[in-house]
Amino acid sequence: MSGDTCVQTWPCSYYLELEKRWVPGRLSLTSLSLKFMTDKTRETLVSFPLSSIIEIKKEASHFIFSSITILERDHSKHWFSSLQPSRNAVFSVIEHFWRELLLSESGAAAEAASSSMTKGKELTCLMACTQKRLEDTARVLHHQGEQLDGISRGLDKMESDLDVADRLLTELESPSWWPFSSKLWKTPSETKPKWDASMADSKAFGKEGIVIQVPAVISQRTESHVKPGRLTVLVSGLEIYNSDSLLMHRFEREDVDDIKVHTPYEISICQRFIGKPDISYRLISAKMPEVIPILEVQFSKKIELLEVAMMLGSTRTSSLAEKGYSVWHAASGLMDQATHCEPSSGSQEGRPLQLQTSEPVISEEDTQELGQILRKLKGLALDTETELERQDEALDGITEAVDRATLTIDKHNRRMKKLT
């Protein structure tokens, strides 16, 4: 499960209060917990959920240098020192996941209530996640369609300009005594402002369309220098901001050379250059599993899943598929029971005992909510299919227009060479 996926592991030392000594080992962080394992015996000395933490601090004293302290609800205090690559880097990552867990809906309250979640609620949550994923994909397709429309308008204007060039070349090729040379061409002045305005509107609306924003821990050159910030995924590219909402760097969509997915929570973005250093950022975020599917749609040819990420992704996908199938199977059976099984007067004596021992049926409220989500999914799927078909037709038209423009430009070049 994603909650058991290791986000980061750091070499460090843990202070044993009873024995008054430091123990070397490794501190491991998952999206839901933190644990320390010794180097010699591989024994787990401490392990606790992030939801039990009430305070994370950077402390130091005359005998404990450059440490991170973690205080739990039961007032247990843990000291970690000799942190690599640096104390600030480890502190920033742990604090980020701790804050995101407290702020998220699936934090401590949702975790406590998950044990009593009914099959109907599980199915509703699964369908809601599917709906959100489809909405994100539809939003990307919508902005992509607007960009294709802008390209089509640009090609139309190019054809209009080539027609003007054709008439101008015809005038230059005609004899000086030809009386109709000045009437061969006119510039459609009313077309250009109209196109420029529509293109500007389309560019302002589609190019800067925000798909998703997530908080992240950002490092650029070395892992020891990290800072909190934000990753913004746009239709036109990616933007990285610091904690003061100041833009650190903007990657245009065509400037991104590769995106590597190291874990479900960590990616690196690189823009390569010849003759000067590459621009590369490494980002860790608790919300990264929501971003990666969108990046796979936008940068399908540039994104690379590394071996660990592929293994974890396939495991998570298979487990989710199995869980989804089991929930669907159970829920469909329960919905059939709730819909088709009407209690008869002769069987009411044994019915209460059967209901007490069986799984709880889907409530009427869950059934109505599922129906609404399914109707929205159907509408989104149909709209997405229509948009894809429209974009296929637009791409065919763009291809034909580019071919025509290429032939026309070649013909004009030959005519201009004859004139010179």
Curated annotation (Swiss-Prot):
One of its GO terms (molecular function) is SNAP receptor activity. Its main location: membrane. Disulfide bonds: none annotated. CDD domains: SNARE_SNAP47C, SNARE_SNAP47N. InterPro entries: PH-like_dom_sf (IPR011993), T_SNARE_dom (IPR000727). Keywords: Coiled coil, Cytoplasm, Membrane, Repeat. Residues 342-357 have a biased composition (Polar residues). Residues 110-172, 357-419 form the t-SNARE coiled-coil homology domain. It comes from the Eukaryota. GO terms for cellular component: endomembrane system; perinuclear region of cytoplasm; plasma membrane; presynapse; SNARE complex. PANTHER family: SYNAPTOSOMAL ASSOCIATED PROTEIN, SYNAPTOSOMAL-ASSOCIATED PROTEIN 47. May play a role in intracellular membrane fusion. Belongs to the SVAP1 family. Forms a complex containing SNAP47, VAMP2 and STX1A. Associates with the BLOC-1 complex. Interacts with BLOC1S6. This is Synaptosomal-associated protein 47. The gene is SNAP47.
